[in-house]
Design a protein with these regions (language model features):
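Conserved Ser/Thr-centered positions that define the repeating blades of beta-propeller domains
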Residues: 240-242, 280-281, 346-351, 394-396, ...
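A short, solvent-exposed beta-strand micro-motif common in secreted/extracellular proteins
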Residues: 80-91
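Primarily secretory-pathway and cell-envelope proteins
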Residues: 19-64, 89-212, 219-223, 291, ...
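Repeated scaffold domains used in trafficking and secretory/extracellular systems
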Residues: 214-222, 255-263, 296-305, 363-379, ...
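Short, solvent-exposed loop/turn segments at conserved positions within beta-propeller repeat blades
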Residues: 320-321, 325-327, 335-341, 387, ...
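Beta-strand-rich domains and repeat architectures in extracellular enzymes and scaffolds
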Residues: 204-236, 256-259
């Protein structure tokens, strides 16, 4: 309950970002220039700049009209001619930020940055050089290009790593007691700082280090016959785990987040959050693009069996007004504008995916989706299972028929054991949580006892054995607990705890339970003891 309250407190504490008034470029070009900046992996909704030598703050919070790419945020605004310095990114103070010049009737490109969490509640802004940057800047100014004195943008100055920016504590607005609770929680749960990242001064060296410590972003890896696992990760990486627990990296020429991976017949296929599918036939040394599905379609799953390729993508369609960042109401718990999430399942028979086509689309209202973890797609015994919102769906590959297989009105998580075919479903709702399993591919369900809440993951391996993790909330912190199903008691036994600030991840019954720490270290559970497999320190 306390974690839910904490989430509500944080939600209400998020500052409201006002959209700037629309401006007529034709009336401004004589005295103003346009400043453009982008953040490849999302932003803070506002860039704060100040005239050089002045403490006056100017907020740039208008969305630039550029082609959408996954979570990228692009902003720009008209500023009076003069010299400026970037002084803030949302609530973060950007010390010694980059300086730039604004000239009448010109566009100034401030560059592209990625905010990187380096631990200890600190963020470093990493400048990124893109080969197609000029095209993005041109797109941002296309609507008013005819009014410009010179269409060539003024390039960004020296783009350097920012100093580590301290993320401030939350001012809840709910009084002193609430603020003290949040501050204490923040203090005792402070993650370790990645000192190697803080020591890096060169952007290329910093990026190289970031790629080596990025954690898996998906729970389903690609598995080789010898037990080697490939996990999707951020910054164009796959985290490779050998059977003996050694971790290394396989990378490709992209900074996007890799969100899916599959291994088949000596090939590795990956999907990214900007809709690209790539393949490697040499273990990840070289990569070729197989398909481009659209820059707003995240590829969340790639599966193969019996001559079928299945690809699951997710696309958000938001009624977003071009030229302004949508501002949530401070009194609304849910988004004030309905958002439709389109989950698409694509199918192909050819190895090169040339015949990839839509098999099914689910249009889901995000306001009706409760704690959705993603589609959790799995291909097992000729059946493709997908959690579409809160409803489990199953595709029979042989017949091409879809069937909804809900054990109840809503489902929070869906798991299928690839060896036994047992399906498990969880509805997480505190004391009202429900657990079900099925031995017949979801046609019928049996309800069993549940672990203590808050339940995060639950996997039944057979009708009489299973594993679960829960977040046990203490007074000012919490611990991840592990549970094993006891059929005699129809209940769950507490069998251990995860290390501090470490989230458990279970691939299967055949792989040791892993744990991903907030400082990017990785542990494994062997013979009841946690062992360090990868240290980011």
């Amino acid at each position: 309950m306390r974690s839910w309250m904490l989430a509500v407190v944080v939600l209400f504490a998020v500052p409201c970002i006002a959209s700037g008034a629309s401006k007529d470029p034709a009336k401004l070009v004589a005295t103003h220039g346009y400043a453009y900046m982008s953040f490849s992996k999302g932003g803070q909704d506002v860039l704060v700049v100040s005239p050089v030598g002045s403490r006056r703050e100017i907020r740039i919070d208008l969305a630039a009209d550029v082609p959408p790419v996954a979570k990228m945020q692009a902003i720009g605004d008209w500023l009076p001619a003069g010299s400026y310095r970037v002084t803030g990114w949302g609530p973060l103070t950007w010390k010694d930020g980059p300086t730039f010049e604004i000239k009448p009737g010109r566009v100034t490109d401030l560059g592209d940055y990625v905010g990187v969490d380096v631990g200890g509640y600190k963020t470093v802004m990493l400048p990124i050089a893109h080969p197609d940057r000029q095209e993005a800047v041109a797109a941002a100014s296309r609507s008013f290009a005819s009014t410009l004195v010179d269409p060539a943008p003024i390039p960004a100055g020296s783009m350097a790593l920012s100093p580590a920016m301290e993320r401030p504590g939350i001012n809840t607005g709910l009084g002193l007691v609430a603020d003290l609770l949040i501050a204490h929680d923040r203090k005792i749960n402070k993650p370790s700082t990645l000192n190697a990242l803080l020591a890096a001064k060169d952007p290329d060296a910093f990026l190289g280090l970031v790629r080596t410590v990025t954690l898996p972003t998906q729970e389903e890896p690609a598995s080789l016959p010898d037990g080697t696992l490939y996990f999707p990760a951020d910054f164009g990486q796959l985290r490779k785990r050998s059977p003996d627990g050694h971790w290394s990296n396989v990378g490709m020429d992209t900074l996007r987040q890799i969100t899916a991976v599959e291994a088949h017949d000596g090939r590795l296929l990956t999907g990214s959050d900007d809709g690209h599918i790539r393949e490697s036939r040499d273990g990840g040394t070289t990569w070729n693009e197989v398909a481009a599905l659209g820059s707003k379609q995240s590829v969340l799953d790639i599966d193969h069996a019996d001559g079928y390729w299945l690809v699951t993508t997710l696309e958000n369609t938001d009624p977003f007004k071009e030229g302004a960042i949508r501002v949530p109401s401070p009194l609304a718990v849910f988004p004030i504008v309905p958002r439709t999430v389109r989950l698409r399942i694509l199918m192909a028979r050819q190895a090169d995916l040339a015949d990839l086509k839509l098999a099914r689309e689910f249009a889901m209202d995000i306001n009706e989706m409760w704690a959705w973890p993603g589609p959790q797609s799995q291909l097992v015994n000729g059946q493709y299972y997908v959690l579409a919102g809160n409803t489990p769906q199953r595709l029979d590959l042989a017949s091409g028929q879809w069937k909804a297989i809900p054990p109840r009105a809503r489902t929070s998580t869906l798991r299928v054991n690839p060896r036994t075919g047992v399906v498990s479903a969880l509805w997480g709702q505190g004391a009202f949580s429900k657990v079900y399993y099925s031995n017949d591919q979801g046609d019928t369900w049996q309800q069993i006892g549940r672990p203590p809440y808050v339940i995060w993951d639950l996997q039944m391996d057979t009708a009489t054995s299973g594993w679960a993790s829960r977040w046990n909330v203490n007074a000012f912190s919490g611990v991840w607990e592990l549970y094993s199903f006891s059929p005699k008691k129809n209940d769950w036994d507490h069998v251990g705890d995860a290390p501090f600030n470490c989230k458990p991840l279970r691939v299967s019954a055949e792989v040791p339970v892993l744990c991903m720490s907030r400082d990017s270290s990785i542990f494994s559970l062997r013979d009841g003891k946690w062992n360090v497999e990868f240290s980011a320190q």
